Regions:
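Short, C-terminally biased terminal segments at protein or domain edges
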Residues: 1-55, 59, 63-128
Length: 128
């Protein structure tokens, strides 16, 4: 499948789209923090958690069961909370130029993931 087809697939799912776009921004931010501030450890922590959100959400969508879906989305949610922590920490020491942009984005992703997990759990419970 071509890059365009992959991106079309991602764009059809709101959480995949949002987490992919966030991941791209985090890659750029992490690179900038490493170059401008020489802060490698925290930039790497942010890079790992920020890109893991979309990776786990993507795994959830192609998961083998509803239980697997919920588990992977929960992991995405945990990674989102971790990303918010690193963003707050880096913003507190002035290593992020426009922290509100990133914090607004991660808060929106967290809201989306909380809703997905909650709805999925309720649907799963209703089946039992």
């Amino acid at each position: 499948m071509s890059l365009i087809k992959h991106l079309e697939y991602i764009n059809k799912n709101p959480i995949l789209k949002k987490s992919f776009e966030f991941g791209v921004e985090i890659i750029k931010l992490s690179k900038n923090i490493r170059i401008k501030y020489k802060e490698y450890s925290l930039a790497d922590q942010l890079l790992r958690s920020g890109t893991s959100i979309g990776a786990n959400a993507n795994e959830a969508v192609i998961g083998s069961s509803k239980k697997d879906f919920i588990n992977k989305m929960n992991i995405s949610l945990k990674e989102a909370y971790e990303s918010r922590y690193w963003l707050l920490l880096l913003a507190s020491v002035d290593n992020i130029k426009n922290p509100d942009f990133y914090l607004d984005e991660i808060d929106e992703i967290i809201r989306m993931l909380v809703k997905i997990v909650k709805t999925s759990k309720e649907t799963e419970s209703a089946k039992k």
